[in-house]
Curated annotation (Swiss-Prot):
Catalysed conversion reaction: Hydrolysis of terminal non-reducing beta-D-galactose residues in beta-D-galactosides
A family per Pfam: Glyco_hydro_2
GO process annotations (BP): lactose catabolic process
HAMAP family: Beta_gal
Subunit structure: Homotetramer.
UniProt-annotated binding residues for Na(+): D202, F602, N605
Annotated Mg(2+) 2 binding sites: N598
EC number(s) given by UniProt: 3.2.1.23
Residues that coordinate or bind substrate: N103, D202, E462, E538, Y539, A540, H541, N605, W1003
Protein name: Beta-galactosidase
PANTHER family: BETA-GALACTOSIDASE
Record keywords: Glycosidase, Hydrolase, Magnesium, Metal-binding, Sodium
An MF annotation (GO) of this entry: carbohydrate binding
Length: 1025
């Protein structure tokens, strides 16, 4: 460029950010990550490379409302008003304009390729020094690993180039622009570009230089690309490593290429070649390419279970053997293919235990650091995940190396989504957009294809299905036939996918949407002519208190071989930290930054909170997906069959521990070392059990423990468990000593019952137990009344909101029927004094606008031991929406900091999400009984409860309960968890019945029929002492 054309005005006049044919100027061709080692040993050991210089750190920064507002002199010198910002970062996290959370709707008027004139612009600059070592010879490159959404680069006032696609590197040759001594970079980043039309993912829309920036020095004669292929024979005992290498800069026949393959510190193989490829066509071959091959006998194969890695070092040497440079990467020998309708890895059919993962951090936005990436992987491995889908864009380059090392199967997904288009395929069927889409697919493959963890390529997400997809599918199959391709858009089973990969298809229920029906996953397999495997690209929408019915999917996966698992939506809540006036942090979601449009709390669908603490749903995923399955075999002898679902791992680090307990009290225990081949079984004979001396239910529990630490778990990690109820020991109860019979006193408006130091008061006008005294100390702050509602879950709300009511949502049906506004009308309140007890009988009709919704009948029997037995019968009116719960509620006066119960726990569980809950006697702090969902909802239920103790109170029966400092009303009316205010005493909810939470998706009613309260009559009993 001439100096005039270097000017900011000249560059901006072209409006490259509104031209889909322009995705870059002067950007170098994509390639695997380079280090340009100058010592082969350093490359082998992946040690520090002196040829890389990080430019991360503090940069000068100025923000403008549009690129036209940027002063011309900015490219030459720092502005006096410029502040500073850390790189990498999103500038919204520093208070410059606002993050926007939108699921589908574009955050600007849809008029492709145009974007708003008011286009927030970040102006970055950095001054750094260069000595002449890098400038006298070779090439100096600058690498931006991720910039959102488009940017222009100047160096020392001269325009260098332009790049877009926020999730892949942009790399430029700076050699001609640099000078010895001080140098200045200037980077103009645009928030919106035509590329933003291809980046309409369900996530926060943020901007800036949010991945690493670095300099790389390469020699003049250099390696510019290398592609590693691993080939295995039919029985996987012989392998060939093939390295295709490209060179540039003075390539001649005197150069040597050397390939070393290392297994740890052992050299496993060596190959040599000189530049020059095989003959390609009638014009010959490439003189700047070479292929090196070496054979490996009995390779240690790579899988997520056994992530065996080799290290390939490619050396470019002179004729005299002097090293010019070396590049290297880890290698995993593995084979991926689809055969007879099954996705196979190394010949074995995979069962994908997967999750979708956005790159998100509550304080750093979309900036990923090493520790957070490792934390995510360790949590996934510890909770029995073996796969991750990079939703919906290529991830930080280090992520893939970590997945290689720790062992996760990866779906690498192109940064393409046009969900807000009408129709969705408007761009993907437009040839003008093929170049932009092509760059996003081809560059992803060129960067990432050497990673063994990547087993599937994805063409993107929710972009309909168009001719551009078909063209890119064909390119992928030609360029990399070693991996299948998946793409869900257009119906999940188009010609552009090797895998049927629906999102939110249900197990048995068809959803016959126009044009793109979602068949049940069982039906999809049997469609005429369909032979592909089915792997759900998204399922089990884990938004808030959700994830019900997850076990049902896994029953189907294990029953039908071609149902090969799926990827849960999704891994981490995308809440962001804000600070209140006192500097206290709180978790924000869509709309909390004044962002418009926004989709509220729909950004929080994670199995873990944004800080990576687990949701209760994570425990359900761990248990349902566990790699060991158990059966208690029939017969007089106690035998347990343990089946391994590992495909490649022998159980060389597992002990099975068993325990026999009665009512939470351990009677016997033992342990057995597991010795199970991949996909094998082991029968374990347990010793004769001791006979219990008292009545009560027996439970047999087995746990698989790893005695030794692994790369992803500590010693003692429990990877699988199961529990069975055994026969209940029956004993003749011993007669109890007679006590003083309770006394009934009838006063004006009250029934009072006294037994020893206990006294109960019933209101005759209302029919409620209004007070309970123990040693003259009042125990209740509110009466014990019926409860039929819950603070709505996200799944109850669906897509309903104040400006757009969905009458099919559970919450709207409950509102319309009057469940939240029903008032009790007393039908009966009577008392009777027996020889050893007092009976109080009540009946209420719960009414709304003259219609009766529920009739509740109760009998309170207070006996001579001070125990109150409550017998409850509820009749539900016909034609009503099924209730959320059938139970009782009251506010207890005393606060005790511990809760003890005999039942399912220790974590929150619901009727359709309790596979992971274990029956035992639990004792937890009161605050641990509350699940801190960012958007407050019903939470904290414990099912299958036989006994509950809280302070001096004891309850027994067969019930579900939650106990909380917050009422259902407050949970329903509060928008964020930090706004909840602890109330006096505690709220106790005891349910005889509770509806499931659902979770197949969160925008339509998804509670399976068997977990809905569809009966007309209900009966349950509670004893309170």
């Amino acid at each position: 460029m001439t100096p005039e054309r270097d000017s900011l005005a000249a560059v901006l006049a072209r409006r490259d950010w509104e031209n889909p044919a322009v995705t870059q100027f002067n950007r170098l061709t994509a390639h695997p990550p380079f280090c340009s080692w100058r010592k082969a040993d350093d490359a082998q050991r992946n040690q520090y490379a002196a040829q890389i210089r990080s430019l991360n750190g503090v940069w000068k920064f100025a923000w403008f409302s549009s690129p036209q507002a940027v002063p011309e002199n900015w490219r030459l010198e720092d502005l006096t008003e410029a502040g500073t910002i850390n790189v990498p970062s999103n500038w919204q996290m520093y208070g410059y304009d606002s993050p926007i959370y939108s699921n589908i709707t574009y955050p600007f008027p849809v008029n492709p390729p145009c974007v708003p004139a008011e286009n927030p612009t970040g102006c970055y600059s950095l001054t750094f020094c260069m000595d002449d070592d890098w400038l006298t010879e070779g090439q100096t490159r600058i690498i931006f690993d991720g910039v959102n959404s488009a940017f222009h680069l100047w160096c020392n006032g001269r325009w260098v180039g332009y790049g877009q696609d926020s999730r892949l590197p942009s790399e430029f040759d700076l050699s001609e622009y640099l000078q010895v001594g001080e140098n200045r970079l200037a980077v103009l980043v645009l928030r919106w570009s035509d590329g933003s039309y291809l980046e309409d993912q369900d996530m926060w829309r943020m901007s800036g230089i949010f991945r690493d920036v670095s300099l790389l020095h390469k020699p003049t004669t250099q390696i510019t690309d290398f592609h590693l292929h691993t080939h295995l024979n039919d029985d996987f005992t012989q392998a060939v490593l093939e390295a295709e290498v490209r060179l540039a800069g003075g390539v001649n026949d005197d150069l040597q290429l050397v390939l070393h393959l290392w297994q740890g510190e052992t050299l496993a193989g060596e190959a040599r070649a000189t530049p020059g490829s095989e003959i390609i066509d009638e014009r010959g071959g490439y003189d700047d390419r070479a292929t090196l091959r070496l054979n490996i006998n009995r390779p240690a194969l790579w899988s997520a279970e056994t992530p065996n890695l080799y290290r390939a070092v490619i050396q470019l040497r002179t004729a005299d053997g002097e090293l010019i440079e070396a590049e290297a990467c880890d290698v995993g020998f593995r084979q991926v293919r689809i055969d007879k309708g099954l996705l196979l890895l190394n010949g074995k059919p995979l069962l994908i235990r997967g999750t979708n993962r956005h790159e998100h951090h509550p304080e750093r936005g979309q900036v990923m650091d090493y520790d957070t990436m490792v934390q995510d992987i360790l949590l996934m491995k510890q909770n029995n995940f073996n796969a991750v889908r990079c939703s919906h864009y290529p991830n930080h380059p280090q992520w893939y190396a970590l997945c290689d090392r720790y062992g996760l199967y990866v779906v690498d997904e192109a940064n393409i989504e046009t969900h807000g288009m009408t129709p969705m395929n408007r761009l993907s069927d437009d040839p003008d957009w093929l170049p932009a889409m092509s760059q996003r697919v081809t560059r992803m493959v060129q960067r990432d294809r050497n990673h063994p963890s990547i087993i599937i390529w994805s063409l993107g997400n929710e972009s309909g299905h168009g001719a551009n997809h078909d063209a890119l599918y064909r390119w992928l199959k030609a360029e990399d036939p070693s991996r299948p391709v998946q793409y869900e858009g257009g119906g999940a089973d188009t010609a552009a996918t090797d895998i049927i990969c629906p999102m939110y298809a249900r197990v048995d229920q068809d959803q016959p949407f126009p044009a793109v029906p979602k068949w049940s996953i069982k039906k999809w397999l049997s469609l005429p002519g369909e032979q592909r495997p089915l792997i759900l690209c998204e399922y089990a929408h884990a938004m808030g208190n959700s994830f019900g019915g997850f076990a049902k999917y896994w029953q189907a996966f294990r029953q039908y071989p071609r149902l090969q698992g799926g990827f849960v939506w999704d891994w981490v809540d995308q809440s962001l930290i804000k600070y209140d006036a006192d500097g206290k942090p709180w978790s924000a979601y869509g709309g909390d930054f004044g962002d418009t449009p926004n989709d509220r709390q729909f950004c929080m669908n994670g199995l873990v909170f944004a800080d990576r603490t687990p949701h209760p749903a994570l425990y359900e995923a761990k248990h349902v997906q566990q790699f060991f399955q158990f059966r208690l075999l029939p017969g007089e002898e106690r035998r347990i069959e343990v089946q391994s679902e590992y495909l490649f791992r022998h159980s060389d680090n597992e002990i099975l521990r068993w325990m026999l307990a009665q009512e939470g009290n351990q009677l016997a225990s033992g342990e057995v070392v597991l010795d199970i081949a991949p996909q094998g079984r082991q029968i374990i004979l347990l010793p004769a059990f001791p006979q219990p001396e008292t009545a009560g239910q027996l439970w047999l529990t087995v746990r698989v423990e790893q005695p030794l630490a692994t790369s992803w778990s500590e010693a003692g990690h429990i990877s699988a468990w199961q529990q069975w109820p055994l026969e209940e020991k029956l004993c003749v109860s011993k007669p109890t000593r007679a006590s003083v019979a309770p006394v009934l006193t009838m006063r004006d408006g009250e029934f009072c019952v006294t037994q020893g130091n206990l006294r109960w008061q019933f209101c005759r006008q209302q029919g409620w137990l209004t007070q309970f005294w123990r040693d003259d100390e009042a125990q209740l702050l509110t009466p014990l009344i019926d409860q039929f509602t819950r603070a709505p879950l996200d799944n109850d709300i669906g897509v309903s909101e104040a400006t757009r009511i969905d009458p099919n949502a559970w919450v709207e049906r409950w509102k319309a029927a009057g469940h939240y506004c029903a008032e009790p009308a007393l039908l009966l309140c009577d008392a009777d004094e027996l020889a050893d007890a007092v009976l109080i009988t009540t009946a209420h009709a719960w009414q709304y606008q003259g219609a009766t919704l529920f009739i509740s009948r109760k009998t309170y029997r207070i006996d001579d031991h001070g125990e109150m037995q409550i017998d409850i019968g509820v009749e539900v009116a016909s034609g009503m929406p099924y209730p959320a719960r059938i139970g009782l509620s009251c506010q207890l006066a005393q606060v005790n900091e511990r809760v003890e119960w005999l039942g399912l726990g220790p974590h929150e569980n619901y009727p359709d999400r309790l596979s992971s809950a274990c029956f035992d006697r639990w004792n937890l702090p009161l605050d641990a009984m509350y699940t801190p969902y960012v958007f407050p909802t019903e939470n904290g239920l414990r099912c299958g409860t036989r006994q509950l103790r809280y302070g001096a109170h004891q309850w027994s029966g067969d019930f579900q309960f939650n106990i909380s400092r917050y009422s259902q009303r407050q949970l329903m009316e509060t928008s964020h968890r930090h706004l909840l205010q602890a109330e006096a005493g505690v709220w106790l909810n005891i349910d005889g019945y509770h509806m499931g939470v659902g979770g197949d998706d969160s925008w339509s009613p998804s509670v399976s029929p068997e977990f809905q309260l569809s009966a007309r009559h209900y009966h349950y009993q509670i004893a309170w002492k």
